[in-house]
UniProtKB/Swiss-Prot annotation:
It comes from Drosophila melanogaster (Fruit fly). The lineage of its organism: Eukaryota, Metazoa, Ecdysozoa, Arthropoda, Hexapoda. This is Sideroflexin-1-3. GO terms for biological process: mitochondrial transmembrane transport; one-carbon metabolic process; serine import into mitochondrion. One of its GO terms (cellular component) is mitochondrial inner membrane. Mitochondrial amino-acid transporter that mediates transport of serine into mitochondria. Belongs to the sideroflexin family.
Length: 321
């Protein structure tokens, strides 16, 4: 058998400069079936990645596609910087099944105050686990950051959901069904900046086209965090808007009155179907390696870059997920 071609498996398989390429990448990375992989399968994938990176033969793989499958399975379960195996519900592959349960619960029981409190708390607990599991290996999230973010986001989501439920109780029922989306959006606007406060305070590292460090910018941090918030909200919008529309139609036609126990199962299954597509498509909205014009940076950062590379017009940074 001829040796496998050598490719850089630490870069995504697909072109990240196009939306389609980013979408394909995240479809593989967030594949919920990866959650079902056994410990032995994950270890096999890890060994393939280690050997291929080291330039050794990988007899387990007949084609380069086999290597890529192992790499995406590896990426779905191991921390990209530390290499540690992540807890199952904190993995990217768990996003769709976990958010299906959470979104379905939020949408089905939005009228009950105890249920609103429970599901918003459950959602923020899940978010905290995801943030901790995917924390930076070089700039880890402190325990204080995690607790502060968790408490503020949970409080923000609860205040938003409960106050809006009270405000719309005499309005169109469809508006009431949209309250969970607004609460989730509000929580994201609190949670993500809190979790990444260090970046807002100190800035993120800027690179040129050859990955040479060019400076540190707080403005780039604001841009990166803002795009992450938009991506998170975009992931939630399809399931949390299409589901209310569907349920409103079923309610008007008397289906829910005839089959009242079908309410929660229908919403949960429909949310799951939507999230299969919404999760990777939302992640793909913005490039992971974001770019920003040098002219739009802080004056001192811009001047420093101009001294190093007068001709450089664009710099890049990691926006996070």
């Amino acid at each position: 058998m001829s040796p496998l071609p050598r490719v850089n498996i630490d870069e995504p398989k697909y072109d990240q400069n196009s939306y389609l390429g980013r979408a394909k990448h995240f479809f593989l990375l967030t594949n919920p079936l990866n959650v079902l992989a056994s410990a032995s399968k994950l270890e096999e994938a890890r060994q393939i990645v280690i050997k291929y990176r080291a330039g050794k033969d990988v007899p387990e793989c007949k084609t380069i596609d086999d290597v890529w499958r192992a790499k995406y399975l590896y990426d779905s379960a191991f921390h990209p910087e530390t290499g540690e195996k992540q807890i199952v519900i904190g993995r990217m592959a768990a996003q769709m099944p976990m958010n299906t349960i959470i979104t379905g619960g939020m949408m089905a029981f939005y009228k009950s105050t105890p249920a609103v409190v429970f599901w918003q708390w459950f959602n923020q607990t899940f978010n905290a686990i995801v943030n901790y599991t995917n924390r930076s290996g070089t700039s880890p999230i402190s325990q204080q950051q995690l607790v502060t973010s968790y408490c503020l986001a949970t409080s923000g989501a609860l205040v938003t959901a409960l106050s809006l439920n009270h405000a719309v109780k005499n309005m169109n029922p469809l508006l009431g069904r949209l309250v969970p989306l607004v609460a989730v959006g509000a929580a994201n606007c609190i949670n993500i900046p809190c979790m990444r406060m260090q970046e807002l305070r100190n800035g993120v590292t800027l690179f040129d086209e050859h990955s040479n460090e060019m400076g540190i910018s707080k403005k780039a941090a604001v841009v990166g965090i803002s795009t992450v918030i938009l991506s998170r909200i975009a992931m939630a919008i399809p399931g949390m808007t299409l589901t209310p529309v569907l349920m409103n139609v079923l309610e008007k036609r008397g289906f829910l009155a005839k089959y009242p126990r079908s309410n929660a199962p229908i919403q949960t299954l429909f949310c799951g179907f939507v999230l299969i597509f919404a999760t990777p498509l939302g992640c793909a909205f913005f490039k992971q390696r974001a770019d920003i014009k040098v002219d739009s940076l802080e004056s001192e950062v811009r001047d420093s870059i101009r001294k190093k590379r007068p001709e450089l017009e664009t710099v890049w940074f990691n926006k996070g997920l």
